[in-house]
Swiss-Prot record:
GO terms for biological process: regulation of vasoconstriction. Keywords: Protease inhibitor, Repeat, Secreted, Serine protease inhibitor, Signal. Salivary glands. This is Therostasin. PROSITE patterns: ANTISTASIN. Gene3D superfamilies: Antistasin, domain 1 (2.10.22.10). Belongs to the protease inhibitor I15 (antistasin) family. It comes from the Eukaryota. The keyword Signal applies. SUPFAM superfamilies: Leech antihemostatic proteins. InterPro entries: Antistasin-like (IPR004094), Endothelin_toxin_CS (IPR019764), Hirudin/antistatin (IPR011061). Disulfide bonds: none annotated.
């Protein structure tokens, strides 16, 4: 039983010391940097953005400012759907959904 406790302690230490982050590929990129959590893992939020989430559904997503931050409860229109959206990798903003695909 004592060996199991030591093994668990070592496993926990390794997770904290060496980062046990999932291989996170964020669908959207940030014009600047991403925020990282207390373990050093990527949160997929742009640095300086508020992570408050609105409870309404926007078919075209939420408006986005020049820093890559989504507005709080302001839905996109057809005119604003892909403004200020930076997609990662080979993804592009889909004007029908406002999401990087």
């Amino acid at each position: 039983m004592r060996g199991l406790a030591v093994l668990l302690l070592v496993a926990c230490f390794c997770s904290v010391a060496f980062g046990d982050c999932e291989n996170t590929e964020c669908p959207r990129a940030c014009p600047g940097e991403y925020e990282f959590d207390e373990d050093g893992c990527n949160t997929c939020l742009c640095k300086g953005c508020n992570d408050a989430q609105c409870r309404i559904y926007c078919p075209l997503g939420f408006t986005t400012d020049a820093n890559g931050c989504e507005s709080f409860c302001t839905c996109n229109t057809r005119e604003t759907v892909c403004q200020n959206v930076v997609c990662s990798g080979k993804r592009v903003c889909n004007p029908r959904s406002g999401r990087c695909e």
